[in-house]
Amino acid sequence: MFRLDGKMALVTGASGGIGAAIARALHAQGATVALSGTRREALEALAAELGERAHACPADLKDPAAPDALVAEVDKIAPLDILVNNAGFTRDMLALRMKDEDWQAVLDVDLTAPFRLARASLRGMLKRRAGRIISISSIVGATGNPGQANYAAAKAGMVGMSKALAQEVASRGVTVNVVAPGFIATPMTDALNEAQKAKLQEGIPLGRMGQPGDIAAAVVYLASNEAAWVTGATLHVNGGMAMI
């Protein structure tokens, strides 16, 4: 089950922890993976680690032309079957102090770029009557978080966008879904002391922070044939932190 042999996948934000884990998991299931992000050296290192069926495809999604160019580059490797919109960043500030450019910068990368990538990917997917679009949102898109009005808006918008797209393309065999991570362990959280980690984990019923592999497993499922009857869904992977 969950094999992806012969499939072509594009993972954005592949140089980060979650993105790299997703790329590794898709590759392990047999997919060819295009690794995109802004850090060329990290992408090339991951491609070298994975070896055959892995390609570094750097792109800066702040550039409005980048999504179309990236999908065209991937299509030259093989027709794109699986798009994983994982790239994103935060620029936190309380709303009263948030500058317009900080609001817009987050929406440009975290919401507008995923839309542009989906639009570019759908051209081929609809012709082939098959495809998977999977976007990585956040628990913050459902619950909100102080100081993250821009990020919360982008991640909530990603869910609404995905539901609309899912309805538009379902008749052509293309599914559109979302994975919403909760609190995931990162190098930043690794630097916390045990007391600080314990406090963070108090709000997680399963008693631990998530790992990038937890998110990657959800993506593999949604990318697989076994998820062919799942579309317009948001899979919350948060240890029970928010039971939505």
Q: What residues fall within each predicted segment?
A:
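Residue(s) in the substrate-gating loop at a strand-loop-helix junction
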Residues: 138
